[in-house]
């Protein structure tokens, strides 16, 4: 048997469907020999049963290793059913971070519950970069319909909040840029953690599934590069605090 044929046979044997078929045939043959006493058929049945079990175990560990590699490569740490569940971990890493980059809308939870941490970040010379939407752009109306609440007011409050904190003349500063395109995901990038999740139809932002990634994975690198690309693209977003 040539090498390529052997590889094909191995791939077929390792398929879950093939494994199940082998196990069923093996059990059937063993049951027949138990009732008729045919040692040859019994030997074949036991051989197939052994092959099926080995294939099942091999497939299980192969899938486990592949999954583990994917998780490690992307740096996935946690999956949260809601953004609200994610907030406690996000708050913890925010308190240790010197800088913040984020894409969203009004960042109400950041302003309401984390203002002290943001001020502390600014006192240490850290910077906050936020990308949001223009309050009066037509695309924002679509998201307001999805969430069934007034987002434009929250964005206007965000701008006033940023101006107020910048007025404290701390070493760091808050920068806000806006655009006219609906973001598909919330993105929150800290010094050593990435948090993100989708904006879903008919759900408030705090009620959608969210993900946490460490700094060593591809996801962190990908999202930070994407943020920087948007931030530096003057045709995409402009200074919202001028």
PLM features: residue spans?
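Juxtamembrane interface helix immediately N-terminal to a transmembrane segment
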Residues: 1-25
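Juxtamembrane "helix-exit" motif on the non-cytosolic side of transmembrane helices
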Residues: 30-38
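Transmembrane alpha-helices and immediately adjacent membrane-cytoplasm interface residues
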Residues: 39-70
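PLD-like (HKD) phosphodiesterase/transphosphatidyltransferase domain
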Residues: 60-142, 224, 228-237
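Short acidic-hydrophobic, aromatic-tinged amphipathic segments that line or gate anion-handling sites
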Residues: 76-83, 176-180, 215
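HKD-type phospholipase D/PLD-like phosphodiesterase module
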Residues: 140-185
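HKD (HxKxxxxD) catalytic microenvironment of the phospholipase D
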Residues: 174-211
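Signature of lipid phosphatidyltransferase scaffolds
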Residues: 196, 200-242
